Design a protein with these regions (language model features):
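Conserved small/polar residues in nucleotide/adenosyl-binding loops
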Residues: 116-120
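Two-component/phosphorelay signaling modules centered on CheY-like receiver
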Residues: 11-29
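C-terminal output helix
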Residues: 92-101
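The C-terminal output helix
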Residues: 102-113
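Short hydrophobic/Thr-rich beta-strand motif most characteristic of the beta2 strand and flanking loop
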Residues: 25-34, 40
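Active-site beta3 strand of CheY-like receiver
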Residues: 44-50
Length: 120
């Protein structure tokens, strides 16, 4: 069973993603902020991290997918340059998210950066 960390500042988004992913057979953990996510990554070997654009990704070599409420080409390019495996806009198309998670877990590309942040 693949382990997914959901890092999002919105409690409703964390809960929605968690419910759906667990229904689909994933094991999930959810974190509201970078500190909680980093602590979880110390204890649990995640297969993928789903992250809101405003959150920094813990440097654990785990592939990540950015979930953004900002639908801009610049934001997407920045995310990919910073190592994101994919960039999806909110509201999330769950079928596309599931495809992205499976693709990332089945064939993860090397994560070339330490963390992702959208401080631009």
């Amino acid at each position: 069973m693949a382990k997914v960390l959901i890092l999002d500042q919105s409690k409703s988004m964390r809960n929605t993603l968690r419910e759906r992913l667990e229904y689909e057979g994933f094991s999930t953990e959810a974190a509201e902020d970078e500190e909680a996510a980093s602590n979880m990554c110390e204890k649990i070997p995640f297969d993928v991290i789903l992250s809101d654009t405003g959150c920094k990704i813990p440097d654990k070599g785990v592939p990540f997918i950015v979930l953004s409420s900002e639908a801009s080409i610049d934001s997407a390019v920045e995310a990919v340059r910073n190592g994101a495996q994919d960039y999806l806009t909110k509201p999330i198309d769950m079928n596309r998210l599931l495809q992205s998670i499976h693709r990332t877990i089945d064939d993860p590309a090397p994560v070339p950066c330490l963390l992702y942040t959208s401080d631009a």
